[in-house]
Amino acid sequence: MSTFVTLSSGQRMPLVGLGTWKSAPGQVKQAVLAALDGGYRHIDCAAVYGNEQEVGDALALRVGPGKALRRDEVFVTSKLWNTKHDPEDVEEACRSSLTHLGLSYLDLYLMHWPMAFKDTWKAMENLVDKGLVKAIGLSNFNARQIDDIIAIARHKPVVNQVECHPYLSQADLLSHCRSLAVCVTAYSPLGSGDRPWASPDEPSLLADPRLGAIAERYQKSPAQVILRWNVQRGVVCIPKSVTASRIQENLRVFDFSLSPEDIRLIDSFNRNTRFIIPTVEKDGKKVWRDGEHPHFPFHDPY
């Protein structure tokens, strides 16, 4: 049973990685160490998470000459933040991430959000030319925006990282990305129950009794069933945890398969629910905080 996908760049990207968004200072280093010691070979981070230095401290203990792992055995992703989209700022932002992480190159560098993006993409392509990153990709882009990038790209995006879980199955976007040889990575694949803006009336994915019933049949946890569902669709998952036992549990999804019937059943849970869009109150109603930005990606159907 394959544990990785092959990107259009030829790189092998492990299907399950450790996410580090919302991991509190002081916890990230131990989480990364627990992940690497437990078999993870894929770490996902970003400048805006504010914890690349801690990730780097952990990598320094386990990766490199004389350490447990060679650099080419660990796939490391980071992301360019919105305030660094000026082409003049892109290389400096990338080098800053590399310094914090203690690395000479990134396996993958993503544009975190589609703000002004065509000139930014060209600057990111230069990072590939200079050997600072092996490949570049996108995050939170809709189908139209992906097409816009591909139309001008010298180095095509290899990944689009988006929110993806049974309540937001992204079937249309996944199909579009497949047709372009763009791999989809799922962030918040377990529904991000600890997101800062969650309200009590929102549904809890992990507590869905239908998932619980499926998990019981396979003698797995609901989290493992969700991750397996995405993995079987060829979607890379980066669940975040700082708990060693959960970090291990999330990787144990390669010793069972869901039946086609159960895959279809979980597909049917889709309700196009996005958890990862900060909302604000406006005229007594909740609205998407960045919804009026000209490049806001979620007004399109997918």
What are the roles of these predicted feature ranges?
Residues 1-74, 190-193, 293-302:
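N-terminal binding-site loop/beta-alpha segment at the start of enzyme catalytic domains
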Residues 22-26, 46-54, 83-88, 114-117, ...:
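Acidic-and-aromatic substrate-binding clefts and catalytic sites of carbohydrate-active enzymes
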Residues 23-36, 85-101, 144-147:
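Short, acidic/polar
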Residues 41, 104-107, 134, 158:
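Short acidic/polar active-site loop segments enriched in Thr and Asp
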Residues 53-64, 94-98, 124-125, 146-147:
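Short, well-ordered amphipathic alpha-helices
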Residues 70-84, 107-114:
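A short, structured active-site edge motif that brings together acidic residues
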Residues 90-110, 126-130:
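CE4/NodB-like, metal-dependent polysaccharide N-deacetylase domain
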Residues 113-302:
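Beta/alpha (TIM)-barrel catalytic core signal, keyed to glycine-rich beta->alpha loops juxtaposed to Asp/Glu
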